[in-house]
Amino acid sequence: MSLSNKTVKELRQLLKERYTVEDELTESIALSSMRFKPSQEPEFHALSQSSLLKTKLKQQSSTDIPSYTHVLISKLSCEKITHYAVRGGNIEIMGILMGFTLKDNIVVMDCFNLPVVGTETRVNAQLESYEYMVQYIDEMYNHNDGGDGRDYKGAKLNVVGWFHSHPGYDCWLSNIDIQTQDLNQRFQDPYVAIVVDPLKSLEDKILRMGAFRTIESKSDDNSATSYYELETIIFDSELNRALFETKLNLHCVIEDDESEQISLNRLIDSMKQYSYLMDSKNVRTRIKLATTSERVSNENKKNIDYQNRSTRSQFCLNTQRGDSTETSSFGSMFSGDNTSDVDMEDRNLTQFDSTDTSLCINGEPSIHVNRVERSSRSTDNFHNSKKRMNSNQEKCHDEGNDMLQRNVLETDYARAKNRILASKIKQYERLRFYKDTFTL
């Protein structure tokens, strides 16, 4: 497949049709194309970072406790929170919100994540997390001498809340979240809790985020803590707005060398496993052929032995029949003549005499031998047929397992190969786009 003659549009169509990747390669695209829903109220249309900072500096201190109804969050903070949550995947993440208050609004200017222990449904901040938070704030936000601290035009940033993720189960506060938020509101108010759902945000390409505060509701003698949602407004800097209006409508995908290397390792592992599967199958086939030939040889020996025994028994039977015939004829010589001087009626039988013929006496052992041989042969035939049946069942079972493993390995190989090809074609498509755009 030659790519040198294809245009950028054809390359993108090729990627869309043949190399559609459904995993981590599309996360950066979805994150960059995610839409932030703006507020529809006219009073918030002209919001900007500089106007909020100027209003903060002009604000007079008040002793009245405000009732917070809005959360103003910068686009930078939204992108950071979304990036942390998407990187966490199905595991919950947690972080701290930095900002200030403005009348009945909580303004979030920046944020940072915490090293926490998270699961799919819970996140716990240990002692090391709080130590990291104190050191980070002291290093990044508490420099007033023009050092490495972040400059927000004289406005001092404080901790105004925390954020965490709910992967796949929407934005709300659980019982543990309510207890944590209520404890923080009691000791370091103003404090707000922001919850983000990264999976639904990637699926819908709209930021799923909610801001919440707790309130103590009293009914009769029982007091219970509930929460309410604050309206969230996203603002941006004037510099970012100007850059957004003049930039090219192109989503630059950040290359992840580790994912490409992982796909290459998976491709190599699939090839090794497939080769091992074929070698083991050949070994089993050779062993079965050797076993089958040995069994056939043993059966041939048994057949030859049976034929020899049958021949010997038939020979003995014929011999015995000949002897009995001679004995009968010899007796008739004496009993058939009436002129014999021997009186047959007066003759007394001795203990050695017998009224039975030798044919009946000698015939019984040969019949018994034939019956035993027939029974032995039928038993051997039954065992041989049973062995052949078991062998056929084992053969079908082994063939089914081999086919299943082969299909799985072929699928893994094709998936890893498509990922690598998609990554390379994406790189070539961007280079081709830059060449066509900036070449005179």
UniProtKB/Swiss-Prot annotation:
Source species, domain of life: Eukaryota
Sequence ranges assigned to domain MPN in this UniProt record: 71-218
Compartments where found: Cytoplasm; Nucleus
Single Gene Ontology BP annotation: proteolysis
Residues reported in the UniProt entry to bind Zn(2+): 164, 166, 177
Gene Ontology CC, one term: COP9 signalosome
Statement: the UniProt record of this protein carries the keyword Metal-binding: yes
Location of the motif JAMM motif: 164-177
InterPro entries the record matches: JAMM/MPN+_dom, JAMM_MPN+_peptidase_M67A, MPN
Enzymatic class: hydrolase
Membrane-spanning segments: none
Keyword line: Cytoplasm, Hydrolase, Metal-binding, Metalloprotease, Nucleus, Protease, Signalosome, Zinc
Biased composition regions of type Polar residues, renumbered to the chain: 319-341
Region (Disordered): 319-343, 376-400
Entry EC no(s): 3.4.-.-
Subunit-level organization: Component of a COP9 signalosome-like (CSN) complex, composed of at least RRI1/CSN5, CSN9, RRI2/CSN10, PCI8/CSN11, CSN12 and CSI1. Within this complex it probably interacts directly with CSN12. Also interacts with RPN5.
Function: Catalytic component of the COP9 signalosome (CSN) complex that acts as an regulator of the ubiquitin (Ubl) conjugation pathway by mediating the deneddylation of the cullin subunit of SCF-type E3 ubiquitin-protein ligase complexes. The CSN complex is involved in the regulation of the mating pheromone response.
Family in the record: Belongs to the peptidase M67A family. CSN5 subfamily.
Domain notes: The JAMM motif is essential for the protease activity of the CSN complex resulting in deneddylation of cullins. It constitutes the catalytic center of the complex.
Protein name: COP9 signalosome complex subunit 5
Organism the protein comes from: Saccharomyces cerevisiae (strain RM11-1a) (Baker's yeast)
Record lineage: Eukaryota, Fungi, Dikarya, Ascomycota, Saccharomycotina
